[in-house]
Amino acid sequence: MKRLILTRHAKSSWDDPLTPDHDRPLNERGKAAAADLGQWLASRDYVPGEVLCSDAVRTRKTFSGIAPALPGAPVLELKPALYHAGPDVMMAVLRHARADVVMMIGHNPGIAEFAARLVAHPPSNPEFARYPTGATLVADFDVADWADVAFGSGVAVDFIVPREIAG
């Protein structure tokens, strides 16, 4: 059994229009949301052993906000290929994962498309199709190796958006 925690980066800042997209940090709401997500993940024992993260600033800072709440220290792997990746690239990266529980942190629109294609049946949450900032899907796969994961084979275990935690 393998478990994927699929998280879109938290809310980023657009304060400086000259900041390149890749370098945009989180805004205050995003920082708070990342911390809330960390608490939510830890409270449900959704703890990754490995984190596959886009190398953009906002995805790295999302993980930095989540990490303090997690027991242990998951291995963080920055993956430039995940920056604005589509579902096929995301799947290729996932198939090289090693831990039983993996977190992937990426960007829309690719992450929403990837989530939709991964699970056999989408969660009932109306935000799933939109996959807003901080949205997190937890999905299980009945495989022994990540290399065997296929689109449509995941079972949605949980789905949350940050405002549902804080609100």
Question: Where are the regions a protein language model picked out?
Answer:
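Flexible, glycine-rich active-site loops centered on histidine and acidic residues
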Residues: 103, 113-127
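Active-site-proximal alpha-helix that buttresses catalytic centers in soluble enzyme cores
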Residues: 2-81, 123, 131-132, 167
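Functional cleft and adjacent loop/helix regions within the main domain
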Residues: 85, 148-167
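Glycine-rich phosphate-binding loop signature in dinucleotide/nucleotide-binding domains
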Residues: 44-46, 96-100
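Generic beta-sheet signal
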Residues: 4, 99-106
